[in-house]
Amino acid sequence: MSNLPSEPEFEQAYNELASTLENSTLFEKNPEYRTALKVVSIPERVIQFRVVWEDDKNQVQVNRGYRVQFNSALGPYKGGLRFHPTVNLSVLKFLGFEQIFKNALTGLNIGGGKGGADFDPKGKSDNEIRRFCVSFMRELSKHIGADTDVPAGDINVGGREIGFLFGAYKAIQNKWEGVLTGKGGSWGGSLIRPEATGYGLVYYVAHMIQYAGQGSFQGKRVAISGSGNVAQYAALKCIELGATVVSLSDSQGSLIAEGDAYFTPEDVGKIAELKLKRQSLTAFEHGGKYKYIEGSRPWTHVKVDVALPCATQNEVSKEEAESLVASGARYIAEGSNMGCTQEAIDVFEAERKEKKDKAIWYAPGKAANAGGVAVSGLEMAQNSARISWTQEEVDEKLKDIMKNAFETGLETPKKYVEAKDGEYPSLVAGSNIAGFVKVASAMHNHGDWW
């Protein structure tokens, strides 16, 4: 890759997968899979385009738009659209690469992709966002379709933006099809879709707790980072299951519960309203229940049983990982994609090996936060059949998918990774190997490598 420009985020994601495969017996037992790794690491297609739009002052603005169609071995490309000034090809390649294996772990027939633009919706009016979405879809519509590529939302692309994008696609292509997921409930959306990533994350961790013989979420203290969609619904589900949530955060700092205080569903609802207005957590009125720590993430300020990073990539550093271990945390699962740095993962995995059943247990995002794309896949199925399932039906299917993802991550390392008696299986190794083998096998059957 030396002839290519540096892509640090993508290289981190690739190296994390490659090192897991190298440190297992997979290549020893199946040396041909080395070829598959080379092939799967290059996207099938990368689409890059300009997005020209007009602001409220009638001034021309231009942004870069992208769609990385990474792998379609298991089904149509599937992955979100992100609108954020930090969006670039490296970030989207990392997200798309992770998405391939995450989608494989759901058991649904969906491939992997990711897209977005370096557009910042903060400070923009509804009309400006609508005009941007229409211009963005003018080009994207040439490359997507219900059986080709089905984008969804991601950071700064919620129900409003999905609506604008869907309306633009319908007008341009003159057809109504399930080309986007995360749609409104009255026009093709699925119940539980907004909640799915957060709920699924908690369902996954519940299996970890149960497997470890520690009962359930009842009475557990939970630290959550972020205050967007994933963090909100993870917090609400934790509270519903009897846990105590003691932190949320945003890009400016962390809100930490003081003394015996904890977040209530009402608190989470008020924070959700602030976030809809794109306001900071500093605007949250709480009567002194919480302390806002500017410029800091929650991990070094809390003593908890469960840590759920739900904000963005690389939000748990080596030092923060060591702090969580020292304070007695037992479970960490990524609600965000690549939420932990590789150095942090190394800390957690070393503890797992050394302290066995007394260790902290780490679950990677490609398994733990697969609930969102899982329900997106269920939305695609409902659109294809022109039906809508009830909330209970979708929730039960989500629970089954998260249970299967956990069990796959649990059983796979027993075949490929040496472990001592009493040691928890490596969920990162199990998830990486299982997802990779499923995709590589399908690609081999299609003649993508030989």
Swiss-Prot record:
InterPro entries: Aminoacid_DH-like_N_sf (IPR046346), Glu/Leu/Phe/Val/Trp_DH (IPR006095), Glu/Leu/Phe/Val/Trp_DH_C (IPR006096), Glu/Leu/Phe/Val/Trp_DH_dimer (IPR006097), Glu/Leu/Phe/Val_DH_AS (IPR033524), Glu_DH (IPR014362), Glu_Leu_Phe_Val_DH (IPR050724), NAD(P)-bd_dom_sf (IPR036291)
Keywords: NADP, Oxidoreductase
Enzyme Commission code(s) on record: 1.4.1.4
Annotated GO MF terms: glutamate dehydrogenase (NADP+) activity
Reaction(s) catalysed (UniProt annotation): L-glutamate + NADP(+) + H2O = 2-oxoglutarate + NH4(+) + NADPH + H(+)
SMART domains: ELFV_dehydrog
BP terms from Gene Ontology: glutamate biosynthetic process
EC main group: oxidoreductase
PANTHER family: NADP-SPECIFIC GLUTAMATE DEHYDROGENASE 1-RELATED
Similarity comment text for this entry: Belongs to the Glu/Leu/Phe/Val dehydrogenases family.
UniProt name for this protein: NADP-specific glutamate dehydrogenase
The species this protein was found in: Botryotinia fuckeliana (Noble rot fungus)
